[in-house]
Amino acid sequence: TIHFLKNLPLVAFFILLFSSCHDEIPIIDAYENTNQTLFVYMPWTGTKNTSENNLKAYFDKNIAAMRQNIEQNKGVKQTDIIVFVAENQTRSVIFRMKYNTTRQRCELDTLKRNAGFVSVSESNLRNLFNQVVSYSNTGKYSLLIGCHGSGWTPRGSDSTMPKALSRAFGGSDIDMQYNISDLRNAIAQSQMKKVSFICFDDCYMANVETAYALKDVTEMLVASTSEVMAEGIPYDKVFSYILGQTDYEKWVDGFY
């Protein structure tokens, strides 16, 4: 009995230790609720057979800048951000960009590896839009496109032009490029039907011809009349203006 009493403080210590371990409250990750969807579309920007002029490295920087802005502003303004990135001519990934309010950080949640949708066709683009809706059925959609482009001229029309690290709609050769009509029909025939805005982070897409072709499938068109350098929009500065209730004035002013 005396021996037990001498060790009683030690026994009590271990009881308290194990009791405190059981009483630890687990961290529960919480995320913002969302009521609208931003689809960030970054297709393959090289050629069908090579990586020439591809912008993948710049897209990676764009995504990092978006994450930085989200963390600085501590949220996504109730916007479900779905991102498609083509890694090469055959492989792509779809992921969700979301804000962990518990840990106060932006996280990437992979939705589909080897996602496909890299080949260029109107039906392929329509199926991709429907895939996005299946991931994020909010009923309100916006579209941000980063790639190469030739404005309103048909696919392949810039094949004789000097190639520089700038943007346009699609890849670097005719096999990887979309006509504006492909985009219009893909939106109209998909479950999206119409989007709040289309932003071309590309060259030469702000013109009457493009705006007229897309007038029935978008409320707003955000684009440039001239070249857009490979770095694209400074998302680290303006991404918060794109999310939620879009502030077009601050968005555009922040770019220039």
Tell me the role of every PLM-derived stretch.
Residues 17-20:
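C-terminal motif of bacterial Sec signal peptides marking the signal peptidase cleavage site
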Residues 37-42, 80-85, 141-145, 196-200, ...:
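Structural recognition of the beta-strand scaffold that forms the well-ordered cores
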Residues 44-47, 87-91, 117, 147-153, ...:
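Solvent-exposed loop/turn segments at secondary-structure junctions
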Residues 22-138:
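N-terminal extension/subdomain marker
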Residues 1-9, 224-225:
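Bacterial N-terminal signal peptides that target proteins for export
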Residues 150-189:
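A short, glycine/acidic-enriched catalytic loop
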Residues 50-52, 93-95, 153-158, 210-211, ...:
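Short, solvent-exposed loop/turn and secondary-structure capping segments
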